[in-house]
Amino acid sequence: MGNASVAVGTAVGIPIAVGVIIALIFWCKLQRRYKKEEIRDADLEKMVMEEVAVSVYDGFKAEINSSSEASTINEKEANQDLKPCQEKTAKAGYTPAYRRQLNASMGTLRPKKQSTAYINVPVIFSGEKVNYGMVRDPSYSFMYPLTLSRKETSSLRSASTSNLSSSTENTALHEEIKLDDPYENDFTNYTVNKREFIDSLRPR
């Protein structure tokens, strides 16, 4: 019985052990193969990522270059479009010399202020004609009163002073009547105050 059990155990155990050993060998080979494939896949992924990154960078660089070129072209076109406008505005707005000439011409055209105290009054000599008691100057632009003698001049002076005083009073009254203040309203007595001021200036 003992020999039979040993024979059966060996007959059954030896093939099972051989099969297990062979399975272990194949499993180890498969594990090594899987590890190699994983390493290859990792390398391939790295290469693909590098290629994708390079392609993306190249595309981005190309887009930047194209956008910069387009912007430079647009700037050049804008500058070319603005040049005639700037030239037109410069031509149209360049007027300093014209203004200087205009100011100079206006300065020459403006008459100089002359004092009224130094007016050359013409004098009538004997033999000259008199037109209604007034003397005309050569340019026929002004009329001056006739002065013939000293007595007449003194009388004329006194009359002129009296006439001046009366005329000043009349003009003051006339201005007082015709005076119209645009800022006057119901709440101000500007005309009354002005009349009182004018009355205070009159001789008493």
Curated annotation (Swiss-Prot):
Keywords for the protein's UniProt record, in alphabetical order: Cell cycle, Membrane, Transmembrane, Transmembrane helix, Vacuole
Annotated localization: Vacuole membrane
Name of the protein in its database record: Altered inheritance of mitochondria protein 20
Keyword Transmembrane appears in the UniProt entry: yes
Gene Ontology cellular component terms for the protein in this record: vacuolar membrane
UniProt record similarity statement: Belongs to the SKG1 family.
Record has S-adenosyl-L-methionine as a keyword: no
Residues annotated as transmembrane: 6-26
